[in-house]
Amino acid sequence: MRFISWNVNGLRACEGKGFSDIFKEMDADFFCLQETKMQAGQLDLKFEGYESFWNYADKKGYSGTAIFTRHQPLSVSYGIGIDEHDHEGRVITLEMADFYLVTCYTPNSQDGLKRLDYRMKWEDDFRQYLLSLDKKKPVILCGDLNVAHEEIDLKNPKTNRMNAGFTDQEREKFTLLLNSGFIDTFRTLYPEQVTYSWWSYRFQARQKNAGWRIDYFVTSERLRSQIADAKIHTEILGSDHCPVELIINN
């Protein structure tokens, strides 16, 4: 079973850069999007054999998530059930027969760490949400989690130490999630591989491969034996992020 996750940094813009062709080529069972930056009705995107679910931010042109699936879910939920967090279109959960699929666009702590305090609250509440699901069925979480966990996960760790996405506080929250019974699938399979999933549009960062790995598939520990592969598709353009992939043995 193939899962794809991609922060498209504006789906309408990405569609103009070949999104539909990439979608079809990747031939996923589940294709999750973050940062769609859309409202309902702005783009009529349908793919044969797929059903789609969308969560839009209240604020226009901001945030937003979507999931395309070939498999009919038992139920779908939007957000995490906490009003403070549920106006930015950041989370969609599909309940399947044997697992929950959660896609997430984690709030960025922003320049000057203006949203770091909010981010810390989000991290704790979102982790509790995942743990509540995990009590019922294994969880597959994917998305732009807006943190490079370890120094290997970004090109310039020393100069970014207190920047959004690589603060000690954000990294500690990710460690806490993993210690709660989850695994970072790519790093589990490839403990020493240096590969990034996001590059700034500035300073020719992508050409220089001065990137960050902030897009993840994180699963419940008990799915470890079913993980066949995890990939980061650095060759695919169309956004400042590239797609990441998880293959699970049924």
PLM ranges: what are they?
Residues 37, 42-109:
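Structured beta-strand-rich core segments of catalytic domains in phosphoester-bond hydrolases
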Residues 60-75, 193, 204-225:
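Conserved beta strand-loop-helix elements of the APE1-like EEP
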Residues 70, 94-97, 220-221, 239, ...:
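Active-site beta-strand termini and strand-to-loop segments that position acidic
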Residues 7, 23-41, 101, 130-151, ...:
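Active-site beta-strand/loop signature of hydrolases that rely on acidic residues for catalysis
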Residues 1-47, 57-63:
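N-terminal, active-site-proximal structural segment of metallo-dependent hydrolase catalytic domains
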Residues 51, 122-210, 214:
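Metal-dependent phosphoesterases centered on the DNase I-like endonuclease/exonuclease/phosphatase
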Residues 81-82, 107-123, 158-162:
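Surface-exposed cleft-lining segments at the edges of enzyme active sites
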Residues 1-9, 98-110, 142:
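Active-site-proximal beta-strand elements of phosphoester/diester hydrolases
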